[in-house]
Amino acid sequence: MVSMHREDAQRREAEELRREIERHNHLYYVEAKPEISDYDFDRLLLRLIELEREHPELVTPDSPTGRVGGAVTREFPPVEHREPMLSLSNTYSIGEVEEFSARVGRLLEAEGIRDRDMVAELKFDGVAVSLLYRDGVLVRGATRGNGRRGDDITVNLRTVPTVPLRLQTLDTPFSLGEGREVEVRGEVFMRKEDFTALNDTRPEEDRFANPRNATAGTLKLQDSAEVAVRRLWFVAYYLDGIQDPDTPHFHRLQLLETAGFFTGGHYRLCKGMQEIAAFIARWNEERWHLPYETDGVVLKLNDVRQWKTLGATSKSPRWAIAYKYPAQQATTVLRDVVFQVGRLGTITPVAELEPVRLAGSTVSRSTLHNFDEMRRLGIMIGDRVVIEKSGEVIPKVIRVVTEARPVDARLVELPSRCPACSTPIVREEGEVGFYCPNEAGCPAQLKGRILHFASRNAMDIQNLGEALVEQLVAFGLVHDPGDLYFLQEPQLRNLERMGPKSAQNVVRALDESRSQSYARLLFALGIRHVGQATARELARAFPSIEALEAASEEELADVADIGPVIARSIREWFEAPAVSALLEKLRDARLPLAAEDPKPLINSNFEGLSVVFTGALLRHDRQSASELVLERGGKIVSTVSKKTGLVVAGREAGSKLEKALKLGLRVISEEEFEAML
C-alpha cells in the first residue's frame, strides 16, 4: 500500500515537473519573459531526468527530457507528406507583387469573390519542416525533401526548444479537437549569435558559410545530443487539422501562438497594396536589427477557402508568393588589398574600402575570398566596386564598375612570399588557397594560434586581446602558447597601454585558466580539423595527452566522429618538431594534460575493451551507456573492426551487427550489458 502511494506521488511529481518545465521553456523562448533563472530551470530538468532514470515507466512521449538529446540514429527513413510541401514563387520588386495581386483579383472575381485580404509575414531563411501531432503530442517531424516525400528527423526536432512536444491547452473558438491529427509547418533556423558561437567552436577550415547551411547540416546529424547544443529554433507559419477548416490564416497564426509555437510575431493582415508595400518597406529597413536572418516577405490570401479556389501549379500555390529583398548593395572605392595570414597559414586577400554605409553599419573592409576570385573580378586598386550584404556577417565585393575605372588604377600585386615572414608561399594540389608553410616561425600564424588558445571556447583567458598578443609576439615574449604561463608582471607593464593593474589582471587570468578541462585544452591546441566536439571525443577516448600522442592513426580513426582525415591531422600535429617543447612547457605550467578527477574503476569488466553500440537501447541513452563503459575501463568506438572487443546490440541493430557477426566478434544484448555493469 505504501509502495502504491509512493508510486502515485512520483507520477504526480513527474507530471507537475513536465508542465512546469514546458511552461518556463515557452516563457523563455517564445514570450522572452523568463520567470526563473537558468540555474533553477536546470534543477527542475535534472530532477525530472533523475525521476525518469529511476522509474522508466514514468517516461512519456512529450517529456522535455527528450530535448537534452542523446539518441543516435543511423539513418533518417523517408516519409510521405499528407499534402505536398510546395515551394513559393519568388518576386523581386513591388511591381511584381502588384501583378500578383491583380492576377489573384481577376481569378477571384471570375468566381464572384471580391474579398482579397492578404497576410504579410517575414520570410525566414531556414530549413522547411513539417510537424505532426496526434492527440496533442508530437509524433513525427520531417524535412520537406522533394515536396512529396521527406526524411523523418523527429529525434533531432525534439531537441529544438521552440518545438512544443505537447500542444498547450487551447481556450479558444478555434479548437484543435480531441483525437485529431494536427500538422504544423514552419522553418528551422539558427539565430545570428548562435551561428557565430557555433563557428567559434569549429576549426577555421570547417566553418559554415551562413546560418542556413549550419541549420541544414545540424538537422542531419546522427547524434541528437550534438543537435541539442547547437540551439536551433523553429518558427511556425502553417496549421492544418483544426475543427473549423474555414478558419482564416491570420487567426491560424494566432492559434499557433496560443498552442505554444513561436511565430516571430511580425505578421499583418493587409487590406490592399498600400499596406503590403508599407510592410515590405518597413522590414527592409528593420530586418538588420532582428536576431535572425530574414530574406523577404511572404504574402498569403487570408481566406483559406480561396486557397482551394485558386489551387496550385505542380511547383507552387497560386494563392501565395514570396517577395525577396534585394541584397543590400553599395558602391565605393577600393583603396588597397591586404593579405592576411591565418593561424593555419592560409593567406586571404581583404579589400580595404572607402568607408560606406551598408545595411545599417559603416563598411570599410570586405572579403575577396581567394586569389582565384580576385582574378575573376579583374579588380584593380582605385576601382569603383559594388559590395553586397545578403545575410553574411562580412560583406563581399561582387563586381567592378569597369566603365568608371580611373586612369591611375593599379594592378594588385599578388604575393609570392608570406606578407608576415617572407617565406615563399605554396599551393597544394587541388586546393583553392595559398598558404605559408613556415608554421613555427611565422609571427602571423603564432598570433592566430595564441588568440585561438585564449578564446572563449578554448582556455577562455580574459584580458588577452589582439593588441596585447601582437606586442607579445613582436617583442619575442611568446613563441608558443606555453610561454604565456611564464610571463611576469614587470614584462607586461613595459608594454604599450599596459599599466600595473592591467598586467596584474592578465597574470591572474592566465592563472585562472589552469582550471579549464583537458578537453578544452585539446581544442585550444589548434589541431587542424579538431573542433570542440572532436576534442571532447578525444578526451574521452584518450584520457591523457600521453595516451593521445601514443595513439596510432588507426586507433584515432576508430573513435566516434573521427575519420581518417582528422586522424592523419592529429598524427601530423604531434610529429611537428615544435610540439614536444610546447607540451613540456604546458606540463611545467601545470595545465590539464589529463582528464580531470579520474574516478577509480567501478569494476574492470570492460577494461581494455573497445565497445561499439548499435541499435536503440531501451533503458539507457547512448551518452549514459558510454559513460558507464568508460567508468569501468572500456573505450567507446564508432565503427566495427577486427580490433573491436565487444558489440552491444539494441533494437533494430543494423549493418554494424551484421559486420560483427561476420567477423566473429562478441555480441551481447542490452540485458547482458546491464549484467556486466
From Swiss-Prot:
Molecular function via GO: DNA binding; DNA ligase (NAD+) activity; metal ion binding
Alphabetic keyword roster: DNA damage, DNA repair, DNA replication, Ligase, Magnesium, Manganese, Metal-binding, NAD, Zinc
Active site: residue positions: K123 (n6-amp-lysine intermediate)
EC number: 6.5.1.2
Cofactor(s), by name: Mg(2+); Mn(2+)
Pfam families with a match to the protein in the record: BRCT, DNA_ligase_aden, DNA_ligase_OB, DNA_ligase_ZBD, HHH_2
Gene Ontology process terms (BP): DNA repair; DNA replication
Domain of life the protein comes from: Bacteria
Record-annotated membrane-spanning stretches: none
Residues binding Zn(2+), per UniProt: C418, C421, C436, C442
InterPro entries: BRCT_dom, BRCT_dom_sf, DisA/LigA_HHH, DNA_ligase, DNA_ligase_AS, DNAligase_adenylation, DNAligase_N, Hlx-hairpin-Hlx_DNA-bd_motif
CDD domains named among the record's database cross-references: BRCT_DNA_ligase_like, LIGANc
Record field: catalytic activity: NAD(+) + (deoxyribonucleotide)n-3'-hydroxyl + 5'-phospho-(deoxyribonucleotide)m = (deoxyribonucleotide)n+m + AMP + beta-nicotinamide D-nucleotide
Residues noted as binding NAD(+) in the record, renumbered to the chain: D38, Y39, D40, F41, D42, S87, L88, E121, R144, E187, K300, K324
BRCT domain sequence ranges: 601-677
Entry GO terms, CC: cytosol
Summary of the function given for this chain in its UniProt record: DNA ligase that catalyzes the formation of phosphodiester linkages between 5'-phosphoryl and 3'-hydroxyl groups in double-stranded DNA using NAD as a coenzyme and as the energy source for the reaction. It is essential for DNA replication and repair of damaged DNA.
Family: Belongs to the NAD-dependent DNA ligase family. LigA subfamily.
Protein name: DNA ligase
Source organism phylogeny: Bacteria, Pseudomonadati, Chlorobiota, Chlorobiia, Chlorobiales
Encoding gene per record: ligA
